[in-house]
Amino acid sequence: KWLIFDRSLLKRTIAYGWASAMQQATVQLGKIGVQAIVNTMGVSVAAAFTAVNRIDDFAYTPEQNIAHAMTALMAQNKGAKRNDRMREGFRCGLVLETIYGILIFIVCFVFARHLMMLFVKDEEVIGHGVTYLHLISIMYILPAITNGLQGFFRGIGDLKITLISSFVNMGLRVLVAAPLVLVCGFGIEALPFSYLAGWIGMLVA
């Protein structure tokens, strides 16, 4: 029986796969756009941005893993028609995301210089990285929340919302960063504010 072709299941799988693929493509295109803007700021800023991206990746990974757990929990309980568990799981997931966002803010803000020194030794590069981390760490609670929300919507099968919100997020990052850097002459400090605009836009979307 496991070889029986299920047309409706195939359509659903393709729809989910397409939405997920487009979401990932959108994120990567946004990162390319931001990197292109960073490259106009000089070698030191580009080096600092490379280092802080690694720190960001470490910071975001637990947030994403909590969101993946929320996705699995939502999907299982939606299938079981346990809306009460879905509500409780969603609430607990957001609480965990928020607590983690606060903790990682403290770590990255207080130890910004030490974290940068793990990757680079040049004082100018470290200075740029510390500036970035002091600003972005304050905002870490926002991606924690947006990751939790995306985990929820993926779990209930509404991937269009996650696709649209990711498109808004990455689009606003580039649209805000470009004039701040290329027109107003801001440095690496412009990037956290462009990310802030993206995360707020993501929540609104």
State what each model feature region is.
Residues 25-54, 58, 76-77, 114-123, ...:
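Helix-terminus/linker motif at the lipid-water interface of multi-pass membrane proteins
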Residues 23, 27, 31, 60, ...:
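Alpha-helical transmembrane segments of multipass membrane proteins
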Residues 48-112, 143-157, 161-165:
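Small-residue-rich hydrophobic transmembrane alpha-helices
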Residues 44-45, 159-160, 187-188:
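Membrane-helix interface segments
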Residues 2-33, 37, 58-62, 66, ...:
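Hydrophobic faces of transmembrane alpha-helices in multi-pass small-molecule transporters and flippases
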Residues 1-17, 74-139, 181-205:
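Short alpha-helical transmembrane segments in multi-pass integral membrane proteins
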Residues 67, 136-155, 161-173, 190-205:
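Short runs within selected transmembrane alpha-helices of multi-pass transporters and secretion channels
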Residues 20, 24, 32, 36, ...:
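Transmembrane alpha-helix boundary and packing residues in multipass membrane permease domains
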